[in-house]
C-alpha cells in the first residue's frame, strides 16, 4: 500500500509509520496520556487505500480524534495539532508571500493594503509567530477554515495568524509598523478579537467592518421595500440587522390609497425571512435579522407565534429573531392585572416616537 506525499512522490505505508507519526505529534503536545494512540492508528490504517494523499490522512486522523473527544479532552488536543500542522504544510511559509498571492489572483485585497504590505513585509515576516496557531482547538480552527481564512477558489491560502496580521496591517498600516505589531500581538495572544465583519473584510477594497445596524421601516410599499433592500445590502457585507416594525399598520387596517385592507406585519416579515436566507453574510454564514415590535401593536399576538414550529406555517417565519420593546407602563399593568389596549399605528399616531412620561401620556 502506498501514499502520495506532498511532493508528489509515492511512499510505502505501514502501521508502524502511522503510529510513529501520531506518537511524534502526541510527544510535541506533552504526551497526551488520555489518548489511546494504537487505537487511533488502527482506525487510520483501516481507511488507507493505495494512492491516498498524506494530507488526506492527516485530515482523517483529525476527524477521528475529534470524534473521540467525549472519551478524553486529550483527543481534542491531538485533533487540533494534527489538522493545524497539516494546514501549515499546505500553505506558504511567509505572510507576505500569501498576501501577494491573494492580491495577484483575487480581488479581495486593496491597493492601499498592498502598498503597506510591501513597505513592512520584512518586519512582519520576521515577527509573525505561526506556533500560536496551535492555541486554537479543533472546532475553532475548523470554523476559521470554513468561513474566515481567505481562499483562492476553494484552496485556503491563509493561516489563522495571517488573518490576524491582515487585520492589524489594515487597521494600523498607515500609523506605522509598531502599531501593526502591537495589535497583532494583542490579537494572537487573545487579549481581544475584532468582530466577524472585520475579520472577513479587513484589507479588502470594500472594507465593511461593522457588526450591527439598526433600521426603521416606513409604512408604505416604497418604504418597506427600501428597508428590505437596505437589509439585503448590509447582510451582503456581513452585517447583522435590527429592524423595528412598530410603525407598520396592523392587519385589517384601512389602506387609504387603494381603499383596501392591510394584511399586517406577518406577510411582510416572511419577505424579510426569505431575504435573510437568500442574502447571506458574504457567502460565509446565514443572514441575521432581528425584528422588534412594541407591545401595544395590534399584531403582537401573531408576532409572538412566528417562531413556533407547529400550527399554520403560512404564518411562521422561523429564520428571523424576535424581540418586544416593553414599556414601564406595560409592566405596571401586568403587575396590577389591568387592561392593556392594542392599536394600529396608523390610528395611534406618535406612539413609536416617544418613550417614558411622553409615551404614558400619549398612550393613556
Could you tell me what each predicted segment is?
Residues 1-364:
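Extended catalytic cores of very large enzyme megasubunits
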Amino acid at each position: 500500500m502506498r501514499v502520495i506525499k506532498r511532493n508528489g512522490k509515492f511512499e510505502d505505508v505501514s502501521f508502524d509509520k502511522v503510529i510513529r507519526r501520531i506518537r511524534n505529534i502526541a510527544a510535541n503536545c506533552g504526551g497526551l496520556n488520555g489518548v489511546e494512540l494504537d487505537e487511533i492508528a488502527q482506525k487510520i490504517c483501516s481507511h488507507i487505500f493505495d494512492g491516498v494523499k498524506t494530507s488526506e490522512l492527516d485530515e482523517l486522523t483529525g476527524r477521528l480524534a475529534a470524534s473521540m473527544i467525549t472519551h478524553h479532552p486529550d483527543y481534542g488536543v491531538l485533533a487540533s495539532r494534527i489538522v493545524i500542522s497539516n494546514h501549515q504544510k499546505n500553505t506558504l511559509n511567509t505572510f507576505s508571500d500569501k498576501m501577494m498571492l491573494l492580491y495577484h489572483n483575487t480581488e479581495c485585497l486593496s491597493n492601499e493594503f498592498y502598498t503597506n504590505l510591501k513597505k513592512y513585509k520584512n518586519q512582519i515576516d520576521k515577527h509573525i509567530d505561526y506556533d500560536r496557531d496551535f492555541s486554537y482547538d479543533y472546532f475553532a480552527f475548523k470554523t476559521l477554515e470554513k468561513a474566515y481564512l481567505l481562499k483562492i477558489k476553494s484552496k485556503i491560502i491563509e493561516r489563522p495568524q495571517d488573518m490576524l496580521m491582515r487585520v492589524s496591517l489594515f487597521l494600523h498600516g498607515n500609523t506605522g509598523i509598531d502599531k501593526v505589531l502591537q495589535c497583532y500581538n494583542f490579537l494572537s495572544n487573545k487579549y481581544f478579537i475584532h468582530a466577524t465583519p472585520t475579520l472577513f473584510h479587513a484589507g479588502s477594497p470594500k472594507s465593511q467592518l461593522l457588526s450591527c445596524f439598526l433600521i426603521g421601516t416606513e409604512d408604505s410599499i416604497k418604504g418597506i421595500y427600501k428597508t428590505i433592500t437596505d437589509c439585503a445590502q448590509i447582510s451582503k457585507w456581513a452585517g447583522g440587522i435590527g429592524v423595528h416594525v412598530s410603525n407598520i399598520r396592523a392587519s385589517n387596517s384601512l389602506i387609504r390609497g387603494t381603499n383596501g385592507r392591510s394584511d399586517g406585519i406577518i406577510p411582510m416579515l416572511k419577505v424579510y425571512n426569505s431575504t435573510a436566507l437568500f442574502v447571506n453574510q458574504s457567502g460565509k454564514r446565514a443572514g441575521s435579522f432581528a425584528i422588534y415590535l412594541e407591545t401595544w401593536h395590534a399584531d403582537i399576538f401573531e408576532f409572538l407565534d412566528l417562531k413556533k414550529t407547529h400550527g399554520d406555517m403560512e404564518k411562521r417565519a422561523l429564520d428571523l429573531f424576535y424581540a418586544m420593546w416593553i414599556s414601564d407602563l406595560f409592566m405596571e399593568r401586568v403587575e396590577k392585572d389591568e387592561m392593556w389596549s392594542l392599536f394600529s399605528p396608523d390610528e395611534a399616531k406618535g406612539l413609536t416616537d416617544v418613550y417614558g412620561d411622553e409615551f404614558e401620556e400619549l398612550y393613556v
